[in-house]
Amino acid sequence: MYRLEQEFNRQGLTLSRQTMANWLLWLYRTSGCAKQAIVLYEYQPTRKAEHAEAFLKGFSGWLHADGYQGYHKLPGNIRVVGCWAHARRKFDEALQTLPKEMQKDAPAAIGECYCSRLFKLEQAFAELTPEERYEKRLEQEKPVLDALLSWANDMQARTAPKSALGKAIHYLQEQWPYLTRYLEDGRLELSNNRAERSIKPFVMGRKNWLFANTPGGAQASSVIYSLIETAKENGLDPYRYLLWVLRNAPGLSETDEAWAEKLLPANAPEECYMPHK
């Protein structure tokens, strides 16, 4: 990136490394209740909401997401579901600003405890049907949510807005309509962790592919990783799957618009799957 910056400077064009690196990878994936898991990565130059709106055109339903405000500008037929892992993390960050001997009885510990209680209840409901989970959430989690909001509203008046705890409380209150939306349907999840796990391969190895020389290269990488991660999510061995694709792709006609669909993970033969233990 440094060499590119210097080369542009020699050509009389000022283009900083920060500008050149200002590219983002968007992730879209199916929920845990989907019969066929799909993981899609899309390269875009910015994080503007218009990219998500274009990608989700024609979609109607729930969208699990973090607290990014851009998602709240999406059409009304897309209902954003907030992430309790992010909310809990805010309280944990507030705790970490305190000496260890003060953390146990700190207000931030109370907020984190409320959030953790929700996750423990979700673990207990994991094997239930969506209909059963919906009922149990209203019965056991709704009271926890009501108590948490009451506590947060009370603490807001006694907490400096710019403090770490103040920011955690503000995030909770601002995101409340989205954080509680998971109560609407038993198929919805408490957090966005499923998507976080899908983006982890890029976070762990981003230095290895930091230098995508062109937008076209970044887009091509997005397609390849979409195929690989979707294959893994569906129990396929990535190596066996790619080997099958490369062996069969040359024999398909590119004039047939459906030729690529035949090579998707959903259509892979049994030989591509991981061996059962």
Where are these regions (language model features)?
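Catalytic center-proximal scaffold of phosphoryl-transfer enzymes
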Residues: M1-K277
